[in-house]
Amino acid sequence: MMGKKSRAVPGRRPILQLSPPGPRSSTPGRDPDPDPDPEADSTAAATSQSAPAAATAAAATSPAVPASAAPEDSPSEDEQEVVVEVPNVVQNPPTPVMTTRPTAVKATGGLCLLGAYADSDDDESDVSEKTAQSKEANGNQATDIDSTLANFLAEIDAITAPQPAAPVVASAPPPTPPRPEPKEAATPALSPTASNGSDTAQTPGWHYDTQCSLAGVEIEMGDWQEVWDENTGCYYYWNTQTNEVTWELPQYLATQVQGLQHYQPSSVTGTEAAFVVNTDMYTKERTTAASSSKSGPVITKREVKKEVNEGIQALSNSEEERKGVAAALLAPLLPEGVKEEEERWRRKVICKEADPVSETKETSTASEETGPSIKPPEVMMDGTEDPSQEELCSVVQSGESEEEEEEEEQDTLELELALERKKAELRALEEGDGSVSGSSPRSDISQPASQDGVRRIMSKRGKWKMFVRATSPESTSRSSSKTGRDSPENGETAIGAEDSEKIDEISDKETEVEESSEKIKVQLAPKVEEEQDLKFQIGELANTLTSKFEFLGINRQSISNFHMLLLQTETRIADWREGALNGNYLKRKLQDAAEQLKQYEINATPKGWSCHWDRDHRRYFYVNEQSGESQWEFPDGEEEEESQTKEVRDESLPKLTVKDKTCTDPNSTESSENPTGSLCKESFSGQVSSSLMPLTPFWTLLQSNVPVLQPPLPLEMPPPPPPPPESPPPPPPPPPPPPPLEDGEIQEVEMEDEGSEEPPAPGTEEDTPLKPSTQTTAVTSQSLVDSTASSPPSNKAVKRKAPEMSTSVVQRSATIGSSPVLYSQSAIAAGHQAVGMAHQAVGMAHQAVSASHAAAAGVGHQARGMSLQSNYLGLAAAPALMSYAECSVPIGVTTPSLQPAQARGTMAAPAVVEPPPPPPPPPTPTPPPPPPAPKVPPPEKTRKGKKDKAKKSKTKMPSLVKKWQSIQRELDEEDNSSSSEEDRESTAQKRIEEWKQQQLVSGLAERNANFEALPEDWRARLKRRKMAPST
């Protein structure tokens, strides 16, 4: 059930909740409480009413409504009343539930509902069957609520003999899920035991509706990928390793789903199952926990809340991570028709259920005692809104019908009070715990709960609050805690643990508040309804979008968490500017993002160094904690490591940088930049990666950029679905097998816009305009390459790489210019940046060295410096470039060629004649002060150096560079010549000029007579020459 539920929760979360409750309560519902179920069953058995309800519920889990009714039925008269009540409630859910029930197998609420509704239409003909009735209830839902109620009652009666009803339900479901429905039928038939059994025999007893996506569920997909089959409207599962495809939920996933369901069922079931189910569930729980003691329910509530919260968060994480918030919201949504029907039905049911509610409330009361639990369903939804959202839907839908109105008010009040408390608590937690570590998970809940939108939404509807939460980047942080993602249960437990703690505290308070709020709840019902309508619409839209994205292979897995963070930040900022986002919420989220980046920075920075951000130069600088020395370049704790990481960072950062530009938030920019860096770093070097590793869960997620860590992207088209077993629909045509794309993202690391040019050390930076830097860079790399010639080994390497570099450098400079490279650029780099080209060419400390040389010393020295640099490059540059490309080449090589010290600027004599010694690093590692530019010649000098360098490079230009330049010229030429204004003469003249320039640049001019100055007596000589031949 949990799995189902989880799925259901993520999938149809809010919308389907309605129907899922029934089904959930039915197979999933009971399953969710499989643990409680047995207890509940036993306990329920003990508690005659509870027991029968539980048993019935368990038995008729599928017919959750009936189950609910059954519980009351068991009580006997309550049974009927309750049944009626249940029907109402159930009707709420029942209609969906009925459908869901048959579809109950599809533990995915909304999706199930969709399937169920479809089924209901199909099954409407089967209305005669009670299962059909339940489905009919669906059909009737649209058609006639009364008839649906009658059907429900009949079904409930049948359920009273639960087994028959369950089987019937089972028969009905088959149409919807492509997978064998019989199992589902069997599960309902199994009765309580079945629910438990179904849990146990997940695939067989417990049936997961393949129409429901696992996307929102916090489960570890492992080698399995969920593939949507348009023909059947169901998901099939594809094992990317074995290429196995199955319509059934693979055992690996089923176990997780069930596990999740265990967590959520209680809350989800309670909430979703229209408090009838809640009643059953809660009854069971209550019975289990305290038979009917409120403390028991409270406990249950807490448990539920925790579970739900955990589950929800896990779900929401996985959901958000896998599908995204939209998907999470969407999944629960039913098709519009269904949604509308549900709404109509819900409204009617709500009116009718007002009475049943009182009856149901008897059960519900216990439930309500647990009520807080049930209300908590809303509250829980609040706290656990992720599942809650679904649950809220169901609660709102079913709960609205019965307890919902009362509980809604109560919940609303409770929610508001609880939320306020939660807010305070969560904020405290957030600020205390949340801000640094799992703040995202907690802050997710706490923030969303406490945060503007969430809280309001929460008060109005816990669901939305959860949604907000789900939407919040927490998903990233949550997802970042891989624990949540990997094992929904673990994640739920891990993340949920924090949440659950908060939620527990909150639940306690909520419980108190809820009781007081119960009264107020009713008033909020209308609001809730409006919210529900809105939710449904949102869900619908989200579902559609999510489905489309999913089909197109667009998902979270293809981007790193930092990218997600960047996008989320940008989106939030945009929303905030529009006035649609609470400023405090935005601030909190930005702080969370900054915290995540901070963690990344901490983990990425070598020991003994601290990483700081220079706002003016928009780049990182590093301070040696012992010496207080600061530098732009990534700490040389191992120069190579530094270079590597730096470079990697540079590469990755440039991407981020570009994105960052879009990002208004400096924090977000930083964060995005850093993140990429770390990702790159990690992928590219073991050393770096180890440094990152500490963040493990979060970082691992962050590193999702790195293909290695990424599971195959959904982009890989799964193999065609297997023929659905026992499922009426013919096997869908196999979707085309997707080419595996999982690692496509990594290429980004190669960014050549790395901004190989680092911002010059503070003060020098502005000297080199970006463009000049770019050109210079190209030239420099050429000259470097040439100078490299002096050092044969490096020469080759450099030459080979230089061309790449020059191009990449140019691009990089552009990127970097706008956004300074973060990590990769070394302090020296900053210096050279002024020199820019040289350092760009190398992109490393050695570059900086050569650059500074060139700048400081003159062209001659430059040449020397360059050669030195190229040497440095030779070993380092090539690797460095490689690292850009591969992110895996350790720059260690570089170190040997040029001692880091040298690179830094101590450079040996060759390095430089004039390079000014790098300014002493600021004594204190205070982050704010940008490190003094090491060896950065004064700006003027730098410029001169650059010019000299440029000249020199002009004399020695690698052929590739020449080619590139000539091509560029030709292109420009074409552009110019294409204009009709230019006449042939001007074009010819231009070409001549260009040729001259090329000759000069390439150094061929020295040997070309056309470039020799004519002697003053050239006319006379010319005459003489002409005369000579004639004579």
Swiss-Prot record:
Keywords: Acetylation, Isopeptide bond, Phosphoprotein, Repeat, Ubl conjugation. These WW domains interact with Arg/Gly-rich-flanked Pro-rich domains found in several WW domain-binding proteins (WBPs). The N-terminal WW domain has the greater ligand-binding ability. The keyword Acetylation applies. Residues 134-143, 190-203, 436-450, 664-677, 771-794 have a biased composition (Polar residues). Residues 400-414, 742-757, 971-984 have a biased composition (Acidic residues). Induction: Up-regulated by p53. Ubiquitous. Highest levels in spleen and thymus. The modification Phosphoserine is found at residues 19, 120, 125, 128, 435, 440, 443, 446, 450, 472, 507, 516, 977-979. Residues 457-466, 943-955 have a biased composition (Basic residues). It comes from Mus musculus. Residues 712-741, 913-939 have a biased composition (Pro residues). Pfam families: WW. Disulfide bonds: none annotated. This is Formin-binding protein 4. The gene is Fnbp4. It comes from the Eukaryota. There is a cross-link at residues 339, 352, 527 (Glycyl lysine isopeptide (Lys-Gly) (interchain with G-Cter in SUMO2)). The keyword Phosphoprotein applies. Residues 418-430, 499-518, 643-663, 985-994 have a biased composition (Basic and acidic residues). The modification Phosphothreonine is found at residue 176. Residues 218-252, 603-637 form the WW domain. InterPro entries: WW_dom, WW_dom_sf, WW_domain_protein. There is a cross-link at residues 305, 352, 527 (Glycyl lysine isopeptide (Lys-Gly) (interchain with G-Cter in SUMO1)). Residues 41-73, 83-92, 469-482 have a biased composition (Low complexity). Residues 1-102, 116-143, 166-205, 355-518, 629-681, 712-813, 900-994 are annotated as: Disordered. The modification N6-acetyllysine is found at residue 294.
